[in-house]
Amino acid sequence: MPGFTVIQFTQDQMRSLTGVSAETVRHWRKTVPYLATKTGKAARFSFAELLGLAVTHELVNCLGVHIGTVSIGVDALFRLLEDSAAPVLEGGIAIITPTAASVRDSGSWSIEPSASPTLAIPLNPLISRLQQHVLPVAPSPSQASLPFPPEAVRSKA
């Protein structure tokens, strides 16, 4: 799409926004093939990749899942997020298995029998947290703006 520039985040920005340490990213690069391409000081991350890192951080830190157990599923998640549009992700739930990943709409998601253990991470809280850091909400003005421009009024005296 001409004229459309994707914002790229540096490694320092990525660590600050996602809360993932440099050592952790280094370890994840060894186990997740998608992250293996993001090496060196020139590595840049898109918003979708930040979201993937935030989901992975939730899996590892909140759910206690070993990254090696779900590395193929996490790799699939990064590739899926890379190809997904932002409106699809909002309100979505990331479904990760040891070998696959998908994003489902939270309104239509239901528990389906699966052949393998499945982890579900809601994306909205993560997207909101990332957006809050990237685009802080400006304070609302104390006076509401007028829906029409002011006009000078003259009296006939």
Q: Language-model features: where?
A:
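Short acidic alpha-helix initiation/capping motifs at coil-to-helix transition points
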Residues: 3-6, 47-52
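A short, Lys/Arg-enriched interface patch at domain edges and termini
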Residues: 50-81
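Polyanion-binding surface elements
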Residues: 1-28
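Short Lys/Arg-enriched helix C-cap and helix-to-coil transition segments
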Residues: 37-44
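Alpha-helical DNA-recognition elements
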Residues: 27, 31, 76
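Low-complexity intrinsically disordered segments
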Residues: 75-157
